[in-house]
């Protein structure tokens, strides 16, 4: 069994989601053949932990913690960067440049880094989204829901009226589009259960050219078994026809809600689920310590 020190600049109780996620993966044995030796929060604690020995790797869960490592370190070191990480200062970039590998949640985070990087992707607790495991009632949406109309979620900051204008009058009138990025949508979706309930019960999520409700909203939708309709095509008839076809199926079924897309859920679980993320950490760490 290999041992890793987790290093964070945050005080106890104020750790980032990314740090807690990696710590949980180690503590629940989701990183095969790796265990957490300890967590340290400053350079002095790191020296003490290393002096105790039996450590294979130090992993910095935020860029500020990478400053704990001396330039002449004699141990393997990796770091993580997440989409919600604070903007990097030039000093933080210099510190990350000294680690052996930085694991990125998304490709866009590589900008400005000179160190070796690997895109590990996001980690998602798919069970929280999967309606077969956590089935959230439609009543969470009662204030805006109308079960006589086809429920759609708009996951980007786009104009609902422009979308409706591309549909026939009949289909437009039958659609209840919840604009997640609007003031009304933000007021409704003020808790994870409500967001997940919308993804579980919407016939589809529409994604346009505007900024997304969440950087990983398409992944969240897939984990909830919610189909995604791409509204960014050059010809709006492409997605307008798709919505119309979906409406025909919904109407033919008597307005009965769709079945979850089980294949989409399985894909997310296999690529970004908790165990998949643990295996990705194992692979990255094994490469570093074998160099």
Predicted features by range, described:
Residues 48-65, 81, 204-208:
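Short N-terminal targeting/anchoring amphipathic segment
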Residues 57-62, 70-88, 100-104, 118:
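Active-site proximal beta-strand in glycosyltransferases
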Residues 90-91, 124-141:
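Acidic anion/phosphate-binding donor-loop and adjacent secondary structure
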Residues 96, 191-192, 197-202:
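Short alpha-helical donor nucleotide-sugar binding micro-motif in glycosyltransferases
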Residues 108, 123:
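Carbohydrate-associated surface elements
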Residues 141-161, 165:
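Conserved donor-binding/catalytic core segment of Leloir-type glycosyltransferases
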Residues 197-213:
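Acidic donor-binding loop of glycosyltransferase active sites
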Residues 237-238, 251-289:
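A charged, aromatic-enriched C-terminal amphipathic alpha-helix characteristic of glycosyltransferases
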């Amino acid at each position: 069994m290999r041992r890793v020190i987790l290093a964070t600049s945050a005080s106890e109780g104020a750790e980032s989601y990314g740090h807690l996620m990696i710590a949980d993966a180690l503590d629940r044995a989701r990183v095969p053949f790796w265990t957490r030796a300890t967590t340290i929060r400053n350079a002095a604690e790191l020296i003490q932990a290393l002096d105790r020995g039996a450590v294979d790797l130090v992993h910095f869960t935020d860029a500020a913690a990478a400053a704990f490592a001396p330039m002449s370190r004699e141990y393997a070191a990796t770091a993580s960067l997440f989409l919600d990480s604070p903007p990097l200062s030039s000093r933080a970039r210099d510190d990350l440049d000294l680690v052996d590998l930085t694991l990125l949640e998304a490709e866009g985070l590589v900008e400005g880094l000179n160190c070796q990087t690997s895109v590990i992707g996001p980690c998602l607790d798919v069970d929280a989204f999967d309606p077969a495991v956590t089935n959230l009632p439609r009543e969470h949406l009662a204030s805006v829901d109308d079960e006589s109309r086809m429920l759609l979620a708009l996951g980007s900051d786009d104009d609902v009226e422009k979308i409706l204008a591309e549909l026939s009058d009949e289909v437009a009138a039958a659609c209840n589009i919840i604009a997640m990025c609007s003031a009304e949508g933000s007021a409704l979706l003020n808790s994870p259960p409500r967001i997940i309930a919308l993804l579980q019960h919407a016939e589809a999520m529409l994604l346009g050219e505007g900024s997304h409700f969440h950087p990983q909203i398409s992944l969240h939708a897939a984990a909830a078994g919610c189909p995604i309709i791409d509204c960014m095509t050059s010809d709006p008839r492409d997605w307008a026809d798709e919505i119309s076809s979906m409406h025909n199926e919904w109407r033919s079924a008597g307005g009965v809600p769709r079945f979850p897309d089980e294949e989409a859920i399985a894909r997310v679980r296999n690529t970004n689920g908790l165990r998949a993320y643990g295996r990705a950490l194992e692979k990255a760490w094994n490469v570093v310590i074998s160099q």
